[in-house]
Amino acid sequence: MIERGKFRSLTLVNWNGFFARTFDLDELVTTLSGGNGAGKSTTMAAFVTALIPDLTLLHFRNTTEAGATSGSRDKGLHGKLRAGVCYSTLDVVNSRHQRVVVGVRLQQVAGRDRKVDIKPFTIQGLPTAIQPTEILTELVAERQARVLSLPELKERVEAMEGVQFKQFNSITDYHSLMFDLGVIPKRLRSSADRSKFYRLIEASLYGGISSAITRSLRDYLLPENSGVRKAFQDMEAALRENRMTLEAIRVTQSDRDLFKHLISEATSYVAADYMRHANERRIHLDSALVLRRDLFSSRKQLVTEQYRHVEMSRELAEQSGAESDLETDYQAASDHLNLVQTAMRQQEKIERYQSDLEELTYRLEEQSEVVSEASEQQADNEARAEAAELEVDELKSQLADYQQALDVQQTRAIQYQQALQALERARALCQLPELTADNAEEWLETFHAKEQEATESLLQLEQKLSVADAAHSQFEQAYQLVVNIAGEVSRSEAWQTARELLRDWPSQQHLAERVQPLRMRLSELEQRLRAQQDAERLLQEFCKRQGNAYQPEELEALQRELESQVEELSLSVSDAGERRMAMRQELEQLKLKIQELTARAPVWLAAQDALSQLSEQSGEALEDSRQVTEYMQQLLERERETTVERDEIAASKRAIEAQIERLSQPSGAEDARLIALAERFGGVLLSEIYDDVTIDDAPYFSALYGPSRHGIVVPDLSLVREHLQGLDDCPEDLYLIEGDPQSFDDSVFAVEEHEKAVVVKIADRQWRYSRYPEVPLFGRAARENRLETLYQERDRLAERYATLSFDVQKTQRTHQAFSRFIGSHLAVAFDADPEAEIRLLNTRRGEIERALNAHEDQNQQQRQQFDQAKEGISALNRLIPLVSLLLDETLTDRVEEITEELAEAQEAARYIQQHGVSLTKLEPLLSVLQSDPQQHEQLQESYVLAQNSQRLAKQQAFALTEVVQRRAHFSYTDSAGMLTENSDLNDKLRQRLEQAEAERTRAREQLRQYQSQFTQYSQVLASLKSSYDAKRDMLKELSQELVDIGVPADANAEARARARRDELHAALSTNRSRRNQLEKQLTFCEAEMDSLQKKLRKLERDYHQIREQVVNAKAGWCAVMRMVKDNGVERRLHRRELAYMDGDELRSMSDKALGALRLAVADNEHLRDVLRLSEDPKRPERKIQFYIAVYQHLRERIRQDIIRTDDPVEAIEQMEIELGRLTEELTAREQKLAISSKSVSNIIRKTIHREQNRIRMLNQGLQAVSFGQVKSVRLNVNVREAHATLLDVLSEQQEQHQDLFNSNRLTFSEALAKLYQRLNPQMDMGQRLPQTIGEELLDYRNYLELEVEVYRGADGWLRAESGALSTGEAIGTGMSILVMVVQSWEEESRRLRGKDISPCRLLFLDEAARLDAKSIATLFELCERLEMQLIIAAPENISPEKGTTYKLVRKVFQNHEHVHVVGLRGFANEMPSLPPIAAELQQGG
């Protein structure tokens, strides 16, 4: 017997009060005992969370919230956890003895919503020695541990060999694995399934009779019969499809003639237009090719003319360029001549200005000397006038002083004072402290002598200074000349530089004299160089035209070669005419042959189309008429063989259908009469009792019962005896077996099992040996397996029958097609292909035309070569005389050498011209530069000192004279003497004043005269300087202009320039004559090109026009061809015989078909619109779209499952054959598919009966359950009255309601709903559809009502309601119901899980204090009998004697809260207690 799986332990990590706690679970009952808040509910919540980790369902409320619709926000889970990572795991050992740890990682999510994050996971293959806490925690110290995170846990588990860790992102996957491993009793596929499971656990946890479960007991206890519903749905879908197909066949039959007419006219309409466009496209392509050939030939001719034009244009451009160059050179030469003449005139001006400057220089020097002398005299006169002025002023002052002192004493005193002042002034000025009035006269003579001596010294210095000035001016003149010639030099190096300049002067003069000979030589060489360059240019042009590079020495041999080539080309051109004539004659013959074959082609093509259709139909390559007749005989033989095989297949198919019908009987009865007999006898078919036997056990039971496996089990055979009398409608052998149908087993037989056989001892003297059948049919699974095989075989035979029927009809139609072909096309069908011959002839014609074109091109090329050779000879005639000049390689070097010498000579000439006069002046002054008169400055300084000494001497003499004159004033000691002396002095002063004024007047007059004379001299000097500066500036400008002109200014240069100009004028005239000649030739060439371009433009216009038509047609044609190929209608539209009809005939054919189509599609809006659009002649693709639309319309109208082809044309051919056969077959199929209402009633009744028996079996397990006054619990199953009436009507009175079930407009479900409404008119169905109501009526669960009843005291059987029971009784009753539900789920899911898996059974019970000891003992007994585990929570005063009990005490130590747990293994006499579980690990950190 399979051992049931068990939960071994529950582990809580980091829960509130439980840091790392593992609860070992008892095999029966585990009791959590403790006071309020000890952690009992927390432990159960951890178990439930690990079992169902769905936050949408979890809600842990205490009993005070039992009826509340909303509890705390966290639904009781957030507050049970501690911060950080938390775990809840279940250690399970299943029926296969596999250890599985399933659990969840929980973690509080920060926020006001107090959410919890849950991640389910599983660990498989964990060794038994390892506890879950060892995996989930890590020791940090001796009494400290750390909780691992989920990634760390995964890493630790995966490091263990053979241990698998799996994390789940979906609760469905988590529960799927738990179901496969036998942890949960039912596969939880959806959230609704999880909700049912949670509601069951919740009802178990909180105890009592859960209204959520009792109201939905049908959903919890009764399995959904999805197979029956699906069978009904498939049957209805098949019937619906069958009816739709039959309706489509009827419509198709009515439209058959329309289809034929539509496809025929559409093919004519579109194919005619299709081939007309194809013909026009081919014609346009041929025209475009002809125009393109003419265009290319014209372009080639134009290219030739353009080449000639380009060559002549190039030569003309070269001549024009040369002319432009010559004109430029001529203009340059003329300009050069003008420049030379200008330079000559400029040189004359320069020479004239140089002579004027020399004269002005001489006059300027003379005038400078005169001005210098006048300046000196002016200075002397100014000094005398100043002295006279001073003397007059002094005398006037003295006289005024004396006149003011009319008082004698006063006057004398003043005079005495003035005399003393004069004496002091004389002492200071003469530096004579010993001077007195007595010795003043002596000193006056001395100082008069000094004055005379200073004057004489000044005159001597003036003479020396004049001589030094003359020498200094010569040195400065010479030095300035050297600086002008050689640039800045020092005064000490001036003589050496001047001597070198005078030494180089003769060589420069010699070079300047060579300018003219060198120019003449250079002119000759340049003329020869230009001739050489012209010859090289002619050679380059010749090489360019010839396309090869030739050396000058090769030209004579080339001339001889070109002359021979001209002779050969003249001979080859003469032979071209004869060949051209022969090719044209052959071309005309080919055209006549092509016309003849074109007339034969349409008849041959029609025969080939018919032959190709026959080949496609037959699959044979028909190469001659003999094969055609032989194949007709083969068709007749094949038709006979196929007909025989078809009849055989039909017989086999009928036999299989009969077998299917027999196996499809309800309850497995092979004969439908057995079902009626079983109802009549009040028994049950044996096959119905064993209907649930597995397919593996079916062979054994089939052999065990042998022929009696189709017998009827009745409770009492004696009651059946009277029914057997007069029994006629029954099988030949009817087996009746006595037994209880509810508890029937196979113990009535004595059986011995053998290999694939059994021996049954029927009696002491009668044994039966039965082998296992190869195809067992006992039991629903075996029958369904056999039916599936038979269905496949029937479908295969049906397909084969349809194929054979189609082949017969196809063979008949193929034979008719062969007959028509022999009568119409056999005479011409096997002739040679005229189109192939036409293609060959067209190929030959193309070759001849290409040969003609090539011949014309070759002839034209030869003519061009002939002309080119003649031009080459002409050019060589000009080049050969110039070969010696071309070979002169030193000419350029000589020109460069002479050019350099001429540049040196011109430079020397310019030097002589610029500095010749200066060198001439410098030559006589060379000796002056040897000594620099530096003493001139010292002499000037001495002269200035002498002037100052003379002026001082004059002032000293004047001061002494004044003292001498006032000498009498020193004797004024008394007033009389003073008056007398004053009168004399006044007279003397007046006399002296008159003399001084006269002297002053003379000095002024003389100063005015000298000033006037000095002004005149200065003006003359300024005028000379201005004239000198102007002429010098003009000379510089003229010299600069001459330098800017850049040409030599000599007579030979003018002659050379004039000769060069005349030479260029002659060359220009020659070039212009050649240019005029080229322009005339170019005009003729351009006229020819214009005519060719006009022709070319016309050809291009015509070509582009027709090419545009071709391109547009191609774009449309490509779209047309793509549409044609994509839709597979090319074979229908491309009718080659139409290619030989002209456009008018095809257009007429298309128009006629269009008229017929308008009438044919008048009632079809879509086709009418598409046809109207297709009439646009510019959009040929729309006709194809119309044809495709017609095909699509026909495909839609012709069912592809009826007609086995995608081509509507072939479908029309098959329609007449296939539609009749399908109509007959589908009608029969509908009759077979239609299920009778009686059969439906029987299926539902049998299902209800089977479920009632299953509920009775479940009730047997609850009969001994008692809680308080409740002595027993049972589940009552009843059929609803309205639904029972429906079943009776379906089975007994179905003939009265055939209007519903035989209606083609109603499905069976809808008919069933209508019948239900008819039987229960008082019921309001609301807005639900009949289809929905009918589908509900096909579900047997809707026919049943389930109620829980309890047997309580004197009241007997009562409906289990919480109000009628005590709390303990309600808890016990609810637990009983939950056990029944779990058992039902296990049986329902038995087929879905492995046969070696018996799932775990575990329920909860919180707050077990409401149960008395007897009730708790009853729970223990129930758990032991049902192999169920139970976890109950009880107060401290309850300690069951059996099972495992955990004492929970919550303690607080150092602000840390933990639960102290002690475990006991019962305390009855026979059960020794377990030692206390070790204290839990202290909380880490």
Swiss-Prot record:
BP GO annotations: cell division; chromosome condensation; chromosome segregation; DNA replication
Subcellular location field: Cytoplasm, Nucleoid
InterPro entries xrefs: MukB (IPR012090), MukB/SMC (IPR050308), MukB_hinge (IPR032520), MukB_hinge_sf (IPR042501), MukB_N_dom (IPR007406), P-loop_NTPase (IPR027417)
Pfam families: MukB, MukB_hinge, SbcC_Walker_B
Annotated segments matching region Flexible hinge: 666-783
GO cellular component terms, semicolon-separated: cytoplasm; nucleoid
GO MF assignments: ATP binding; DNA binding
UniProt entry tagged with the keyword Transmembrane helix: no
Keywords from the named record: ATP-binding, Cell cycle, Cell division, Chromosome partition, Coiled coil, Cytoplasm, DNA condensation, DNA-binding, Nucleotide-binding
Coiled-coil ranges per UniProt: 337-480, 509-605, 780-805, 835-915, 977-1116, 1210-1235
Highest taxon above the source species: Bacteria
Location, primary (coarse class): cytoplasm
Notes concerning its domains: The hinge domain, which separates the large intramolecular coiled coil regions, allows the homodimerization, forming a V-shaped homodimer.
Quaternary state and interactors: Homodimerization via its hinge domain. Binds to DNA via its C-terminal region. Interacts, and probably forms a ternary complex, with MukE and MukF via its C-terminal region. The complex formation is stimulated by calcium or magnesium. Interacts with tubulin-related protein FtsZ.
Membership in a protein family: Belongs to the SMC family. MukB subfamily.
UniProt protein name: Chromosome partition protein MukB
Gene, per the UniProt record: mukB
